[in-house]
Amino acid sequence: MSDAAAPEEQDELSGGSVQELLPGLQRDLEAEVIRGFIANIAIYPVLLLYFFGTFAYVTRNVVPYEFIDEQFHIGQTITYLKGHWFTWDPKITTPPGLYILGWLNYKVLKPLLKSWSTLTILRLVNAFGGLVYFPLVVLRPIFLFNAISFWPVALMSFPLMATYYYLYYTDVWSTIFIIQSLSIGLTMPFGLSKSIWLSALFAGISCLFRQTNIVWCGFIMLIVVERQAIIAKQFNTHGLNNYLKLFIHSVEEFQTLVLPYALNFVGFFLYLIWNRSITLGDKSNHNAGIHLVQVFYCFAFLTVFSVPLWFSKNFLRMYLERTNRKQVQVFFEIFLIMMVIRYFTKVHPFLLADNRHYTFYLFKRLINHNRRIIKYGLMAPIYHFCTFVYLEILRPSELLFDPISPLPIKDPNLLPVQLTHISWTALILCTFATVVPSPLFEPRYYILPYFFWRLFITCSAEPIWGEIVPGKSNEEPVTISSTSRLFLEFVWFILIDIVTLIIFVRYSFPWASEAFMQRIIW
């Protein structure tokens, strides 16, 4: 669904089953949706057995003790369980959302699971959230809205988040609450006003788990206002004019569309005044700065995780053709990336001192290699390609408009889950705003940039390696489908999950300062 305004695609926007792409070439959208539903229904129970079985094994046999940051998170939750609500560990840098949720979870489950340890019960918070609540409550409504673009069973298996289903970290519920906000903002299940207030509430709650979620709260607000303004103000191809229409509509409908989210910004501003910093606790090791190369780290991770979505002969050919066609421009783009590597790479002491994370090995052996041919000559072109992937995979999913005629859709709730040129720009800016200030090279920080990017991607139906050959005029049209790519995305995530789990289970080493064996995670 790339060009919603094109006349030949009005059938698709209004719910048509077969989409004619070219003479002799079509997509059967209804068949793709049915296959997607069947696959998700069949895979989900097996996935639950795998993840909960793995959870039991890891918790009992691999790390039946507090692991890395868990010592702070578990300790603070136990402090709350003891009733010491105003005692705070100064080494903790995130708000108390996880500890309040953990306290509630413990109070509910401990009477039912008396023989279970406190550690296991608290870890169940993330296991339940990621494996049950996230796919069924958060992702399912968007899937029903846009079933040919992603599978919930794949996104719940996303490796950067699935790792923390076994541990007591803030990332799972931070993601759940902010994506819940987006889900409600897109689908409006309770009517316009109630849905927006509920969406804003979930966005605000998510900030109790990670402060930078306030940025994504702003993005969700823009999405909500934009989807209403597209219809009310009849967006067209005049880009700057659409910005003005969006602004006018946000002012006219401030109380309904903007105020609920604006209250979150007011609360966050008061928090900054009170705390004098975005970081709680250990501010000395988490000073914000300009770490521009983080953007390329993020794009590189997203490119690797999205291989099944973009990889094809045609996509690679498109990159090479652009490189050949714009050689001078590409040269300066790569030169600019080299300058970013040279002057905007921050080496945090934690990164070089902690060999329990993949980033330690990636940074030491590849990203910051002492040979310049690798650090600059290899990594700069890689970052250039990854940036191309990030931008180009979104381009076919952009919602386009006609210069004169308005969209055939009259109800904002029926708009496809696509970005316009405005929200497309906002997504990039929000990604910059969340990753650039961080001094730490932490893949966990790329979870939300990934989900906000992935949920707006319309999966390609192009064959991965073959060529599309439309049927002849006297033959049945050739039907292409995105089902195989969506299935491969799920398989790709599961393979990464299994490999990282094997490394986590099989490879251990001692630390002089720790009583238990240490292991490697993201």
UniProtKB/Swiss-Prot annotation:
Q: Which residues are glycosylated?
A: N275
Q: How does it sit in the membrane?
A: Multi-pass membrane protein
The entry lists its GO molecular-function terms as:
dolichyl pyrophosphate Glc2Man9GlcNAc2 alpha-1,2-glucosyltransferase activity
The record's catalysed reaction(s) read: an alpha-D-Glc-(1->3)-alpha-D-Glc-(1->3)-alpha-D-Man-(1->2)-alpha-D-Man-(1->2)-alpha-D-Man-(1->3)-[alpha-D-Man-(1->2)-alpha-D-Man-(1->3)-[alpha-D-Man-(1->2)-alpha-D-Man-(1->6)]-alpha-D-Man-(1->6)]-beta-D-Man-(1->4)-beta-D-GlcNAc-(1->4)-alpha-D-GlcNAc-diphospho-di-trans,poly-cis-dolichol + a di-trans,poly-cis-dolichyl beta-D-glucosyl phosphate = a alpha-D-Glc-(1->2)-alpha-D-Glc-(1->3)-alpha-D-Glc-(1->3)-alpha-D-Man-(1->2)-alpha-D-Man-(1->2)-alpha-D-Man-(1->3)-[alpha-D-Man-(1->2)-alpha-D-Man-(1->3)-[alpha-D-Man-(1->2)-alpha-D-Man-(1->6)]-alpha-D-Man-(1->6)]-beta-D-Man-(1->4)-beta-D-GlcNAc-(1->4)-alpha-D-GlcNAc-diphospho-di-trans,poly-cis-dolichol + a di-trans,poly-cis-dolichyl phosphate + H(+)
The domain of life for this entry's organism is: Eukaryota
Q: Which UniProt keywords apply?
A: Endoplasmic reticulum, Glycoprotein, Glycosyltransferase, Membrane, Transferase, Transmembrane, Transmembrane helix
Location(s) in or outside the cell = Endoplasmic reticulum membrane
Which residue spans traverse the membrane? 36-56, 119-139, 142-162, 172-192, 205-225, 254-274, 292-312, 330-350, 373-393, 421-441, 446-466, 485-505
Pathway the protein acts in: Protein modification; protein glycosylation
Q: Which cellular component terms (GO) are annotated to the entry?
A: endoplasmic reticulum membrane
State the EC number(s).
2.4.1.256
GO BP, one annotated term: dolichol-linked oligosaccharide biosynthetic process
Which Pfam family, giving just one, matches this sequence? DIE2_ALG10
The entry sums up its family as follows: Belongs to the ALG10 glucosyltransferase family.
State the protein's name. Dol-P-Glc:Glc(2)Man(9)GlcNAc(2)-PP-Dol alpha-1,2-glucosyltransferase
Native source species:
Candida glabrata (strain ATCC 2001 / BCRC 20586 / JCM 3761 / NBRC 0622 / NRRL Y-65 / CBS 138) (Yeast)
Q: Which gene encodes it?
A: ALG10
